[in-house]
Amino acid sequence: MPTEPSPAATDARAAVAAALRDVPHVPGAPKPDPVLIADDVRRMFGGVNAVDVDHVEVQRGAITALIGPNGAGKTTFFNLLTGFDKPNSGKWTFDGRSLGGVAAARVARAGMVRTFQLTKALNRMTVMENMRLGATAQPGENLFAALVPAVWRPREKAITEQAEELLARFKLDTKRDDFAGSLSGGQRKLLEMARALMAKPQMIMLDEPMAGVNPALTQSLLGHIQALRDDGMTVLFVEHDMHMVRHISDWVVVMTEGRIVAEGPPDSVMNNPAVIDAYLGAHHDTDLGDDALLDDAVLEQLRTEDEEAR
């Protein structure tokens, strides 16, 4: 990562902060330029409301964290929005287009892609083959077009070039011909994020991108997530590490028992009694993102990250 942010990155962060400055810190707060709007989304399992979201909006171009204790419904909500599960009720739009009830493949083609808490790399395929699978608009998938190389070869070349660029960006280019199953857990997280970008999405949804990743790769992932925002992409991610959430998020949405109970900038949310109660019970004198709770090594990493972002 560079020691100083580029002018474009600084402008992107400032623009997001300015856009969200006057947004009220309440659940379901309206945003000035929402790319995703969801209303009355419900999902029940055996009579239990796993998701019970009245209204939520995600600001275009921002990094929004979706946090909450285990079992809060975060991943289930992701599954509903991206077509991997069906709600009992509800509707949502992405960039003005209704995506309720739309299949996962069509959601991805619409510009909203996701990664998974447990990586979905195809272990017996190479890293490059995994990357190529992430691209859309592949004429070679059509039986008749596949019989005419002149139809699909130009697109295949463009896809390969795009994959090479992304692998270099994520420092996986030396692994291009390795089987995905040979990668470390952190490298598979990087591969999944890079593969998602092959679809050239407007918005990427990351489900616990830091889970099981060693500290060195954690810093790399944080940098990549911030770079997506700086390039104008919208990021919505689930994360349990409150310190990471505080240091990279523009906005935080909090779920518990399927409901959204708080929203706001990281510092505001970390001190919200409703949020602290959801995580820690009655310990309302605790700041969930208090850096004093970190060990010296991790705190130094985060301070370095902040200095580089200024």
Regions found by a protein language model. Name each.
Residues 67-69:
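The feature captures the beta-strand-to-loop junction immediately N-terminal to the Walker
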Residues 204-208:
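Catalytic Walker B motif of ABC-type/P-loop ATPase nucleotide-binding domains
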